[in-house]
Each structure stands twice: as C-alpha cells, then as structure tokens.
C-alpha cells in the first residue's frame, strides 16, 4: 500500500484527484491539505510515501514548501499545476513527474505506474528556491506566515522548534538543519540559530558568551560558535 497526501488550495481539485485515487487499490490517501503550513505539519507527522503537490498556492507556494522539507525524509513528489511553460520545462529537464490541470485520467494512470516502479524521491532541491522568504508557523490553533526578516532567533527543546520574532514566539515544523541551510540565520549554540541583524550586544563570558537581541532577549553563545559569530562583525 502506498500512502499519499494531496496538497492543493482548491477544494474541487483536491476532491477530484482524491476520487480518482480512491479507485486505485494500492493507494491510501492519508490526508488532504489546503495550504503549505498544513502540508508541512502532515508530512512531518505522517511521513507519506507520495505527495501530489499543487505548485501555485497563495502565500507559500508548492515550490517553497519543497525547500522547507528535510532532504533526508523527503517523500516522492508529483507536481500538479495549471499549464506553466517554465515550470513544465523544468520538470521535463529533470524528469520529474507532473500532472497538468485538469488532470487527464490516462496521464494519472501512467504517472502512478512510474511511481509504483520507483518510489525513490527525486532531487527536487534542483528546482526549489535556495532561500526561504517566509516561515510557516503556528501559535495554538492559529497558522501564521512569518517574514524571515522579522525573525530574531530560533531554538529547539523537547517540545519542538520555537521562533522568536517581532510579534512574539511561535512554533514551526521546520528543522534547524533546514533553517540553517535556507535562511540567513546562523548557529550560535547547538540548540540556537540567530539572525546577525538582530544582535545588539555580545557579552563575553567564561563559558562562551551571551547575545542581547534588539528586542532585549538573551541568547546563549557556546564557545564552539563564538569565534565565527564575532568574525561576522569584524572581531577576531
């Protein structure tokens, strides 16, 4: 059984695809998501083998969602799009699976045959954005899209990944690895990433240092990262 997730902001498109997939005996639809934040949470929690992903979604596009996923746990992606010459060309150049809206039954059947033969995730990072402009976050039952320039630092603990921004603290499903690779945030501690632009002061301590951010928060700096952090500002 192949577990799959459908991600599309259009309800009719999701239901139409789900109806077609429900006729396949070896496909189990584990969920449907209407936006990238819901999709990131579901992919992280449920770990579907296959994701049908609409690339033209508001605020955070399907391509941006790809950039947010950890390459080590990436599912097989089938892109879904209204005709977009440049996107289709990119998909063809890299031999990625894609479906054009409205989805043709024969095309879907051929795509599923290829997927059944090979569930190995593609190197979709080749066409994903190199950096993130927004972070998908949540606060209680509210989903939030935080501009990366509003983020002062992020940190991890047993309850997850926390984002400290100009409007308070929220949570994200993004990993520290993805955040370090796709944003201007840099390591200052094993459990912390910080925006250099948010640093107001660095106080040197016997055990490392402590940063005071522009909003007045205190962030630890371990000895391991102190030198590289100082060098960002021209200190030796």
Swiss-Prot record:
The modification 4-aspartylphosphate is found at residue 54. PROSITE patterns: HTH_LYTTR (PS50930), RESPONSE_REGULATORY (PS50110). Keywords: DNA-binding, Phosphoprotein, Transcription, Transcription regulation, Two-component regulatory system. One of its GO terms (molecular function) is phosphorelay response regulator activity. One of its GO terms (cellular component) is protein-DNA complex. Residues 135-235 form the HTH LytTR-type domain. One of its GO terms (biological process) is regulation of DNA-templated transcription. CDD domains: REC_LytTR_AlgR-like (cd17532). Signal peptide: none annotated. Residues 3-116 form the Response regulatory domain. It holds the Pfam family Response_reg. InterPro entries: CheY-like_superfamily (IPR011006), LytTR_DNA-bd_dom (IPR007492), Sig_transdc_resp-reg_receiver (IPR001789), WalR-like (IPR039420). This is Uncharacterized response regulatory protein SO_2823. The lineage of its organism: Bacteria, Pseudomonadati, Pseudomonadota, Gammaproteobacteria, Alteromonadales.
